[in-house]
């Protein structure tokens, strides 16, 4: 029975009517578009039979070119030829300048600190550049299918954060495309692989593209694709292989580090050509800037070995998250052009103890999976029982009193998902509540990441604990988070969609997870202390209000005993002895029991005053 039917109301077509849909792999280095024709998913080629479209755009005053034509201008007009724009999506200018200091583009910052690229066509942001690539792919599909597309599925790296995913959606909208769904690239590969092989069990999807690395551990069972865990690096890929090799060639050739952009581009082109050749040959001759030399596969392997090791460390973390051992993995699916590098295949095979699968073209498999999914979502396969369960990489929650984090959705929860929890007011007469959305695995706010803040106003003025606020976290199929807070009695609500301007790297995510394990015992103790301090503050706040209203109900001796107990609680609450605070709270409760009973009796008498027994 289906756990999650992937279909959208209103999109099912009549039996005789077929809607046109496409899957788009919007890659860092190359992009592809695919569709399903006659029951088979296939990538679409250009007029020259080329399936890959270089993710490069060349801008001029009178227009722009995309793909191969644009790439030929890279060395001639570097500043106006934008490549690997996917790496810039959702990042601030400061982040880009820190991560990629050698980019040959001139940047300006927008008012909110986001990057604007200076080109002959004016200031352009990464969303606009991505939109131009998507337009070129859509035009190829429209021509091949002889009709306008009804919808597309676009793939993104599993580690893309909210801002990067939203930027991809915005680019598609700018390109005039209806986005059926954003799909994680490893998951798209699982769809293509699962349909073609029909195997069941645990599968690892190792996706090393031009600019990103993703590892996904999936369980395939009777048409259900469940992502058990994900990991990776949003800033590691074949481009890094190219730059390492280019730097090595530059050193061997004696080319100055600060040479002009044209020489830098020649170096990079030579490195790319050498990398490709070394996948088949043991050595290759390189000619660049008047220098000629030999590069061996062994030398290349030494350069990239640390990067390959980083990918395997991410694989190890993902396996741990999934709760499986490497020998439980039945197959390893290779995705991305960079998996053609022999050292990558060799080390991955050694790590998992089996040769990786390479029967499906690693450049095309993601686009093929996206096309299959698009065909379902557009309504051409309304009875399909394919299931697709993605996960969120870090827990989501709220700040509560005392600087604590209350987790609402734990990490590795499958998405889409909606979870709700009820909260209440801390003070008498409280009419507003600040909602602080957190991300992370630790117990205290100071150790987690702040995502967003918003306020719920218009809460009825009731005694502390009298108002009930339901906070709902909803993560959609694209990984975008919406948080809604609603006061139950009035229905007043406030909400926010979380779109951070830039997100976390995989190393930061891994560090947060590691810290949560390393400091688990310490965090639990800190949480217990914070909870007791919050309870102490609540008790004292309530007691002070009661004394201000009804102190006349107490004798002098009783008042003194209560004051002494409250003073002691106030004192120990400043320390870090959890047991002492707990005992002091119990003592205040003991000293005020009679006082509370008298206040209750007085309230009842006041309520009954002026009423007859019959009325009661």
UniProtKB/Swiss-Prot annotation:
Q: Which cysteines are joined by disulfide bonds?
A: none
Q: Which Gene3D superfamilies does the UniProt record give? A: 1.20.1270.10, 3.30.420.40, Actin, Chain A, domain 4, Substrate Binding Domain Of DNAk, Chain A, domain 1
What CDD domains does this protein map onto?
Answer: ASKHA_NBD_HSP70_HscA (cd10236)
Matching InterPro entries: ATPase_NBD (IPR043129), Heat_shock_70_CS (IPR018181), HscA_NBD (IPR042039), HSP70_C_sf (IPR029048), HSP70_peptide-bd_sf (IPR029047), Hsp_70_fam (IPR013126), ISC_FeS_clus_asmbl_HscA (IPR010236)
What Pfam families does the annotation carry?
Answer: HSP70
Q: Determine the domain of life of the protein's source.
A: Bacteria
SUPFAM superfamilies for this protein: Actin-like ATPase domain (SSF53067), Heat shock protein 70kD (HSP70), C-terminal subdomain (SSF100934), Heat shock protein 70kD (HSP70), peptide-binding domain (SSF100920)
Query: Per its record, what are the GO molecular function terms?
Result: ATP binding; ATP hydrolysis activity; ATP-dependent protein folding chaperone; unfolded protein binding
- Asked if the record carries the keyword Chaperone, the reply is yes
Keyword terms, alphabetized: ATP-binding, Chaperone, Nucleotide-binding
Q: Name one GO biological process term.
A: iron-sulfur cluster assembly
Q: What does this protein do?
A: Chaperone involved in the maturation of iron-sulfur cluster-containing proteins. Has a low intrinsic ATPase activity which is markedly stimulated by HscB. Involved in the maturation of IscU.
Among HAMAP family, the record links this protein to: HscA
Q: Which family does it belong to?
A: Belongs to the heat shock protein 70 family.
Name the record gives this protein = Chaperone protein HscA
């Amino acid at each position: 029975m289906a756990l999650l039917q992937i279909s959208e109301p209103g999109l099912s077509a009549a039996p005789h009517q077929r809607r046109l849909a496409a899957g788009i792999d919007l890659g860092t280095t190359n992009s592809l578009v695919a569709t399903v024709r006659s029951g088979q998913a296939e990538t679409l080629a250009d007029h020259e039979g080329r399936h890959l479209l270089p993710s490069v755009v060349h801008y001029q005053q009178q227009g722009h070119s995309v793909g191969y034509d644009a790439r030929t201008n890279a060395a001639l007009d570097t500043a106006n030829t934008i490549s690997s724009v996917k790496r810039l999506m959702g990042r601030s200018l400061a982040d880009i300048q820190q991560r990629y200091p050698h980019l040959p583009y001139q940047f300006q910052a927008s008012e909110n600190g986001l990057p604007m690229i200076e080109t002959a066509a004016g200031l352009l942001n990464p969303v606009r550049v991505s939109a131009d690539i998507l337009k070129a792919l859509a035009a190829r599909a429209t021509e091949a299918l002889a009709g306008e597309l009804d919808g597309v599925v676009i793939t993104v790296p599993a580690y893309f954060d909210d801002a990067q995913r939203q930027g991809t959606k915005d680019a598609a909208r700018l390109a005039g495309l209806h986005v059926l769904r954003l799909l994680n690239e490893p998951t798209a590969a699982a769809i293509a692989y699962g349909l073609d092989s029909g195997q069941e069990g645990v599968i690892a999807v190792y996706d090393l593209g031009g600019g990103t690395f993703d590892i996904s551990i999936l369980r395939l069972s009777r048409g259900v694709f469940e992502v058990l865990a994900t990991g990776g690096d949003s800033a590691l890929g074949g481009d890094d292989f190219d730059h390492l090799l280019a730097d090595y060639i530059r050193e061997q050739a004696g080319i100055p580090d600060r040479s002009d952009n044209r020489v830098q581009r020649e170096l990079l082109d030579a490195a790319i050509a050498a990398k490709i050749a070394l996948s088949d040959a043991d050595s290759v001759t390189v000619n660049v800037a008047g220098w000629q030399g030999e590069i061996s596969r062994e030398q290349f392997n030494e350069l990239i070995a640390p990067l390959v090791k980083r990918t395997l460390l991410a694989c190890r973390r993902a396996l741990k998250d999934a709760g499986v051992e490497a020998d439980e993995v039945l197959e390893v699916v290779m995705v991305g052009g960079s998996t053609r590098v022999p050292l990558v295949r060799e080390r991955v095979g050694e790590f998992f103890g089996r040769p990786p699968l390479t029967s499906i073209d690693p450049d095309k498999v993601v686009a093929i999976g996206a096309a299959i999914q698009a065909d379902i979502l557009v309504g051409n396969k309304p009875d399909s029982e394919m299931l697709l369960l993605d996960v969120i990489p870090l827990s989501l929650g709220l700040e509560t009193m005392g600087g604590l984090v209350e987790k609402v959705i734990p990490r590795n929860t499958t998405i889409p998902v909606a979870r709700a929890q009820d909260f209440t007011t801390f003070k008498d007469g409280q009419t507003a509540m600040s909602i602080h959305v957190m991300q992370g695995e630790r117990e205290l706010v100071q150790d987690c990441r702040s995502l967003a803040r918003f306020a719920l106003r218009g809460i009825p003025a009731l005694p502390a604990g009298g108002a009930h606020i339901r906070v709902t976290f909803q993560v959609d199929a694209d990984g975008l988070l919406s948080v809604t807070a609603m006061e139950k009695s009035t229905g007043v609500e406030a909400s926010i969609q979380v779109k951070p301007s830039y997100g976390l790297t995989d190393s930061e995510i891994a560090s947060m997870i590691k810290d949560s394990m390393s400091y688990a015992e310490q965090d639990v103790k800190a949480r217990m202390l914070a909870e007791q301090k919050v309870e102490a503050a609540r008790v004292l706040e309530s007691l002070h209000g009661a004394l201000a209203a009804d102190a006349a109900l107490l004798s002098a001796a009783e008042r003194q005993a209560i004051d002494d107990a409250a003073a002691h609680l106030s004192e120990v609450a400043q320390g870090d002895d959890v047991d002492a605070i707990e005992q002091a709270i119990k003592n205040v409760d003991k000293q005020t029991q009679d006082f509370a009973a008298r206040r209750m009796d007085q309230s009842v008498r006041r309520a009954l005053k002026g009423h007859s027994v019959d009325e009661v």
